[in-house]
Swiss-Prot record:
Native source species: Yersinia pestis
Cofactor: Zn(2+)
GO annotation terms (biological process): methionyl-tRNA aminoacylation
Gene: metG
Positions occupied by motif 'HIGH' region: 15-25
Compartments where found: Cytoplasm
Catalytic activity annotation: tRNA(Met) + L-methionine + ATP = L-methionyl-tRNA(Met) + AMP + diphosphate
Name listed for the protein in its UniProt record: Methionine--tRNA ligase
Keyword Magnesium listed: no
Keywords from the UniProt entry: Aminoacyl-tRNA synthetase, ATP-binding, Cytoplasm, Ligase, Metal-binding, Nucleotide-binding, Protein biosynthesis, RNA-binding, tRNA-binding, Zinc
Length: 675
């Protein structure tokens, strides 16, 4: 009995329309596209949509900086985004924008239903206001000193140094990031979505088993801490949709952004004419709805979004498919290192299938971060796609074309081996279906090893030179081509461009349901190179080009030029270092050393012995006695030839005679902690 085809709607998170697509974005779109292409190969009806997230203060301000209207900026950005996604063969059925008539109508409809059902609450709040720009300031547009660790230049919602969260009003000496003016407090009436009213429904959804375990666990933490009402409005000036019957009030971008999924699908329905919007979004819809998103936006998609849909009488998502972040060479993407690589820059240098394959080989259904190691990227693509898969075709096609007029043999040389390959279809399909593409790739490459071992053992290049063995040569090479066909069928969701060239070469479409029937007596076309090896030089050029995309850095002079600032550490790392004020009671030369001084330090109740390499700077050690300095007090004792050193004194300078012992300000006492 044939399986009934599913009807599936798939979305990716909407890219924000104030910047270019980069390789971090591409992880999600590639993951979703692989899953969508597989579902289509299996006969399911899939509608794959996305849109630009085109509203909010950042877009309004960036357009002002560019001297253009926001509408022009988001239109240009949409064109760039769509070009990048097309370059990576992301098979969207529709790519739209949240700044659309469909989205305006649906946002108003959902808001109206929520309000009518009693889920919208009004209350007056106090906010920071920029008196020069005449606008209320979002959290990220206020900067000041962290109220917890006192780090300067921190955003209005959290500190990037100590990790603390707070409200913008708690900042010390806050400034508007827009004008630099000191903001003032003003009151404004805002509208709130009553999220706590949906707590029971959301907890039941969480426990349903549909969500990834990591997502469900995170949601439970939020439930335990208590859900809060959600502010869904912003005051003018704001680029977005005005709230019906509330002049000067606009929907917060995160209210209309997920509704953009619905707007993009509504736009597709209107274009096509054969799709029913309610079949996919109606309260009792039997179709499937999946959102591919990053772990940074789980909060909005797992709490606000299903609650909004429930409260406005629409269906909830079938599931959220959440992925981790992308690092490059083991670190956060960096513009200075050239590893913040835009999608458009990548496409100038490399085949999109290469990145699609590398991501696929690393992806699983878990919310794990993916590292794009550029050297491993080159090696893996060349080893797997070129050496294992494409090489299988090139090793056999030449003989088929030259000796047998491009026609494959009428029988399989090894039906048992061929069945081993086709039997793997079930487990590989399960892996793809469960978003375990890394597992699928491992199984496919294991088969590729078997196929190449078969060719190595049969040695067609030797058989070709032996008289009377044409039939053997024909059978061996035809078997090799058929194994290549099975492998490429399995790889079709991952490698669309290579698949297209392969289908032209094999003169047949690669379909999942046809692999059990080998190509027998079938004509193939002349073999042409199907895939080029990645040249590491090209990768290095891409990285260099990504560096050049930045504005020229100001030339550093002085001490920083000779001794650059080290890699950033976390506040927790810094907090492990215990620095104390110390009184130098005694300072003396160390016999047998022309670099060290022996210091006896008093820490207010405890005495330490420290050996310090400052002799060249302080030829008269007695001059140091009675002086206050700073020492690292919790450094592990170090056994030296002259004795045990029980800490380290702090000094500045390049070394030699240019060393300057640090001293605290007057009033500091021995033993005081340096913070």
């Amino acid at each position: 009995m044939a399986q009934v085809a599913k009807k599936i709607l798939v979305t990716c998170a909407l890219p924000y329309a104030n910047g270019s697509i980069h390789l971090g974005h591409m992880l999600e779109h590639i993951q979703a596209d692989i899953w969508v292409r597989f579902q289509r190969m299996r006969g399911n009806q899939v509608h794959f949509i996305c849109a630009d997230d085109a509203h909010g203060t950042p877009i309004m301000l960036k357009a002002q900086q560019m001297g253009i209207e926001p509408e022009q900026m988001i239109a240009e950005m949409s064109q760039e985004h769509q070009q990048d996604f097309a370059g990576f063969a992301i098979s969207y059925d529709n790519y739209h924008s949240t700044h659309s008539d469909e989205n305006r109508e649906l946002s108003s409809l959902i808001y109206g239903r929520l309000k009518a059902n009693g889920y919208i609450k009004n209350r007056t709040i106090s906010q920071l206001y920029d008196p020069e720009k005449g606008m209320f300031l979002p959290d990220r547009f206020v900067k000041g000193t962290c109220p917890k660790c006192k780090a300067p230049e921190q955003y209005g919602d959290n500190c990037e140094v100590c990790g603390a969260t707070y409200s913008p009003t708690e900042l010390i000496d806050p400034k508007s990031a827009v004008s630099g003016a000191t903001p003032v407090m003003r009151e404004s009436e805002h509208f709130f979505f009553d999220l706590p009213a949906f707590s029971d429904m959301l907890q039941a959804w969480t426990r349903s088993g549909a969500l990834q375990e990591q997502v469900a666990n995170k949601m439970q933490e939020w439930f335990d801490s208590g859900l809060q009402q959600w502010d869904i409005t912003r005051d003018a000036p704001y680029f977005g949709f005005e709230v019906p019957d509330a002049p000067g009030k606009y929907f917060y971008v995160w209210l209309d952004a997920p509704i953009g999924y619905m707007g993009a699908f509504k736009n597709l329905c209107d274009k096509r004419g054969d799709l029913d919007f309610d079949e996919f979004w109606g309260k009792d819809a039997k179709t499937d709805l999946y959102h591919f998103i990053g772990k940074d936006i789980v909060y909005f998609h797992s709490l606000f979004w299903p609650a909004m849909l429930e409260g406005s009488n629409f269906r909830k998502p079938t599931n959220l498919f959440v992925h981790g972040y992308v690092t490059v060479n083991g670190a956060k993407m960096s513009k200075s290192r050239g590893t913040f690589i835009k999608a458009g820059t990548y496409l100038k240098y490399l085949d999109a299938d290469c990145l699609r394959y590398y991501y696929a080989a690393k992806l699983s259904s878990r919310i794990d971060d993916i590292d794009l190691n550029l050297e491993d990227f080159v090696q893996r693509v060349n080893a797997d796609i070129v050496n294992k898969v494409v090489n299988l075709a090139s090793r056999n096609a030449g003989f088929i074309n030259k000796r047998f007029a491009g026609q494959l043999a009428d029988q399989l040389a090894d039906p048992v081996l061929y069945k081993t390959f086709t039997d793997a279809a079930t487990s590989i399909a399960d892996a793809y279906n469960n978003r375990e593409s890394g597992k699928a790739i491992r199984e496919i490459m294991a088969l590729a090893d078997v196929a190449n071992r078969y060719v190595d053992e049969q040695a067609p290049w030797v058989v070709a030179k032996q008289e009377g063995r044409d039939a053997d040569l024909h059978a061996i090479c035809s078997m090799g081509i058929n194994l290549f066909r099975v492998l490429m069928t399995y790889l079709k969701p991952v490698l669309p461009s290579l698949t297209e060239r392969t289908e032209a070469f094999l003169n047949t479409e690669l379909t999942w349901d046809s692999i059990e029937q080998p190509l027998l007596g079938h004509s193939i076309t002349a073999f042409k190179a199907l895939f080029n090896r990645i040249d590491l030089d090209k990768v290095n050029e891409m990285v260099a080009s990504s560096k050049e995309d930045m504005a020229p850095a100001t030339r550093v002079t002085g001490p920083l030029a000779d001794d650059p600032i080290q890699e950033t550490i976390s506040f927790d790392d810094f907090a492990k270092v215990d620095m104390r004020i110390a009184l130098i009671q005694q300072a003396e030369f160390v016999e047998g050393s022309d670099k060290l001084l022996k210091l006896t330090l008093e820490l207010g109740g405890e005495t330490r012995q420290v050996f310090s390499g400052i002799r060249s700077a302080y030829p008269d050690p007695k001059a140091l006695e009675g002086r206050m300095t700073v020492m690292v007090a919790n450094l592990a004792p170090r056994k030296m030839r002259f004795g045990v050193s029980e800490g380290m004194v702090m000094a500045a300078g390049p070394g030699g005679s240019d060393i300057f012992l640090l001293s605290p300000d007057s009033g500091a006492q021995p033993g005081m902690q340096v913070k």
